[in-house]
């Protein structure tokens, strides 16, 4: 990880869960990290914790609504003017709404698509442009995907979400192919976790907290830090090593 020291990583959805764990891990490794979310109170608290802990890196909170392209473009412009540009882009932000295919709301589908697919694609495009215009040829795009991007689980309320995650799988491989055709050594990786104990289920089942809690009670789930360790592993591999996808799940998870 020494080659990444003092370089800049962007982490979307950094206000909690996997995003916060990834941001902390990168700061521990000596990186400058721009952590973005719609609200930055939690990121500001995490930045203060990292500073008081004496970690060698820095966490920079940035308020950004990823469903708004202008917000995303403004963020990349600010990063360019204040920090030169992005060397690592970790597309972590994602959401699920309980909108089924037979009776779901169009607004719920759009909300998932806008964040899980479009925002990820816009951030990827802007990050790659930032790298290439500065002749950064060892940058890395890491998409925090899901096991739902590789198989469709039975619960109907996860089916549209799964479709957005299948899109992430395709987008990551498509990006790898385009970068190779452009003779770039920027790398593209998916990390696809199974059940991770976060607030994800509580947001999906916000009207049924007992159902949400049950998601995490029947087995020992992954922790956000487990996914953060996978991110560090991917970044620590030599530049000639291309890791396309890491699928990880709790040992007790059925599918």
Swiss-Prot record:
Protein localization: Secreted
Any Pfam family: adh_short
Its job: Catalyzes the conversion of the 17-keto group of estrone, 4- and 5-androstenes and 5-alpha-androstanes into their 17-beta-hydroxyl metabolites and the conversion of the 3-keto group of 3-, 3,17- and 3,20- diketosteroids into their 3-hydroxyl metabolites. Exhibits reductive 3-beta-hydroxysteroid dehydrogenase activity toward 5-beta-androstanes, 5-beta-pregnanes, 4-pregnenes and bile acids. May also reduce endogenous and exogenous alpha-dicarbonyl compounds and xenobiotic alicyclic ketones.
Family statement: Belongs to the short-chain dehydrogenases/reductases (SDR) family.
Signal peptide: 1-25
A single GO BP: estrogen biosynthetic process
CDD domains, A to Z: Mgc4172-like_SDR_c
Reactions catalysed, as given in the entry: a 3beta-hydroxysteroid + NADP(+) = a 3-oxosteroid + NADPH + H(+); 17beta-estradiol + NAD(+) = estrone + NADH + H(+); 17beta-estradiol + NADP(+) = estrone + NADPH + H(+)
E.C. designation(s): 1.1.1.270, 1.1.1.62
Organism: Bos taurus
Encoding gene, per UniProt annotation: DHRS11
Pathway given in the UniProt record: Steroid biosynthesis; estrogen biosynthesis
Active site, per annotation: 161
Binding site for substrate: 146, 161
Chain positions recorded as NADP(+) binding sites: 13-18, 38-39, 44, 65-66, 92, 161, 165, 196-199, 203
GO cellular component terms, A-Z: extracellular region
Protein name: Dehydrogenase/reductase SDR family member 11
Source organism phylogeny: Eukaryota, Metazoa, Chordata, Craniata, Vertebrata
Activity regulation details: Inhibited by flavonoids including apigenin, luteolin, genistein, kaempferol and quercetin and also by carbenoxolone, zearalenone, glycyrrhetinic, curcumin and flufenamic acid.
Recorded GO MF terms: 3-beta-hydroxysteroid 3-dehydrogenase (NADP+) activity; estradiol 17-beta-dehydrogenase [NAD(P)+] activity; nucleotide binding
């Amino acid at each position: 990880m020494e080659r990444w020291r003092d370089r800049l990583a962007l982490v979307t959805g950094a206000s909690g869960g996997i995003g916060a764990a990834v941001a902390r891990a990168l700061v521990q490794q000596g990186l400058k990290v721009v952590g973005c979310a719609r609200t930055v109170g939690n990121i500001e608290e995490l930045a203060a914790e990292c500073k008081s802990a004496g970690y060698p890196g820095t966490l920079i909170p940035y308020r950004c609504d990823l469903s708004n392209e202008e917000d995303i473009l403004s963020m990349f412009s600010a990063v360019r003017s204040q920090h030169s540009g992005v060397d690592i882009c970790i597309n972590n932000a994602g959401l699920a709404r309980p909108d089924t295919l037979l009776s779901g709301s169009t607004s719920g589908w759009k909300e998932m698509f806008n964040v899980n697919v479009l925002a990820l694609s816009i951030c990827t495009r802007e990050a790659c442009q930032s790298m290439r215009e500065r002749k950064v040829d060892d940058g890395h795009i890491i998409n925090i995907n899901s096991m739902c991007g590789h198989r469709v689980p039975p619960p109907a309320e996860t089916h549209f979400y799964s479709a957005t995650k299948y899109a992430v799988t395709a987008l990551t491989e498509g990006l790898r192919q385009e970068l190779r055709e452009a003779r770039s050594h920027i790398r593209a990786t998916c990390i696809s976790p199974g059940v991770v104990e976060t607030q994800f289920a509580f947001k999906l089942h916000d009207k049924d907290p007992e159902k949400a809690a049950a998601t995490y009670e029947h087995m020992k789930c992954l922790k956000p830090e487990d996914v953060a360790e996978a991110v560090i592993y991917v970044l620590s591999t030599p530049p000639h090593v291309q890791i396309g996808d890491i699928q990880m799940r709790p040992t007790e998870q059925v599918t």
